[in-house]
């Protein structure tokens, strides 16, 4: 039996979706373009860099999550007129939520471990400049495998548990009934986010401290690193707040709706904001993505990734 809330204004809820559509669709196309550059047209440049190899995985999971948001997840939240029919459809075709929901969570869960490795990567660049490339090249396959498998350590209970429709706003979200009561995804996420946040702060503090001691201080690189750190950290802190509510204080339905919004803000901040920050701060990537003077940039980029004295990996 449908539990759709008909008290919500169809027009207002639809406008909420289209307001997000305005930046999510360009975000999807933007991430797709970045992946084409890194994995396709300029793969000989970027895949030589352990940093961009790892960061491209972040672009991939962001692309997946934003695509699902704009084509599925936020449609059944912000289109009250579709709620009844869509909810019945998903209850009949139960395999759809059983596949889409874990897949969506997989994408965002992977981001925390990816950003941990990115922070460690940047720190090792300045701490071990002569060994940096060799160490990461030697262990890159292991790092990628770990990143791909890590989300399952958090999501296994979601995968095996029964899914149901949780009606919020004028629509609904997909949730799950824990088959293993103690294995809460929100609690797992809190641990993961706290770890990522801690690693980001510690490694970037070490990186900035080391850079400040260089004979020729790279003030612009230091400033860029601070901006990137602040942006990424704010995204995980906001998500941490939402997960803390879901893990320990979930009860008041109105508050649940507020924290769903907070969670979406954190998703969008990381998924849409991260590539914008990188494009803004990395001249080489910006030139390749927007086809600005590509020829001269190729030679500079190649030397960038092989010159131990160049700190461009920290964001130029």
Swiss-Prot record:
GO terms for cellular component: membrane. The keyword Transmembrane helix applies. Pfam families: Srg. One of its GO terms (molecular function) is transmembrane signaling receptor activity. It is a multi-pass membrane protein. Belongs to the nematode receptor-like protein srg family. This is Serpentine receptor class gamma-4. It comes from Caenorhabditis elegans. The lineage of its organism: Eukaryota, Metazoa, Ecdysozoa, Nematoda, Chromadorea.
């Amino acid at each position: 039996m449908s539990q759709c809330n008909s008290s919500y204004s169809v027009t207002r809820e639809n406008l909420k979706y289209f307001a997000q559509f305005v930046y999510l669709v360009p975000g999807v196309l933007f991430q797709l373009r970045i992946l084409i550059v890194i994995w396709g047209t300029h793969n000989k440049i970027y895949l030589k860099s352990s940093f961009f190899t790892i960061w491209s995985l972040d672009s991939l999971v962001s692309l997946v999550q934003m695509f699902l948001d704009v084509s599925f997840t936020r449609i059944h939240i912000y289109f009250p007129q579709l709620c009844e029919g869509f909810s019945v459809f998903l209850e009949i075709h139960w395999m759809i939520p059983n596949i889409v929901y874990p897949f969506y969570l997989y994408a965002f869960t992977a981001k925390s471990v990816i950003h941990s490795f990115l922070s460690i990567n940047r720190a090792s660049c300045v701490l071990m400049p002569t060994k940096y490339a060799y160490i990461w090249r030697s262990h890159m396959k292991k790092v990628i495998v770990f990143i791909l498998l890590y989300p399952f350590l958090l999501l296994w209970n979601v995968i095996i548990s029964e899914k149901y429709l949780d009606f919020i706003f004028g629509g609904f979200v997909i949730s799950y009934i824990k088959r293993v009561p103690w294995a809460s995804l929100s609690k797992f996420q809190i641990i993961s986010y706290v770890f990522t946040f801690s690693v980001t702060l510690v490694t970037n503090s070490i990186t900035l401290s080391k850079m400040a001691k260089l004979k020729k201080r790279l003030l612009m690189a230091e400033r860029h690193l601070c901006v990137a750190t602040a942006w990424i950290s704010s995204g995980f802190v906001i998500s941490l707040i939402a997960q803390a509510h879901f893990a320990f204080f979930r009860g008041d339905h109105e508050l649940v709706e507020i924290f769903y919004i907070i969670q979406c803000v954190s998703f969008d901040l990381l998924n849409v904001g991260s590539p914008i920050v990188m494009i803004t701060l990395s001249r080489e990537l910006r030139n390749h993505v927007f086809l600005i003077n590509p020829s001269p940039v190729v030679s500079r980029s190649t030397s960038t990734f092989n010159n131990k004295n160049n700190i461009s990996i920290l964001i130029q």
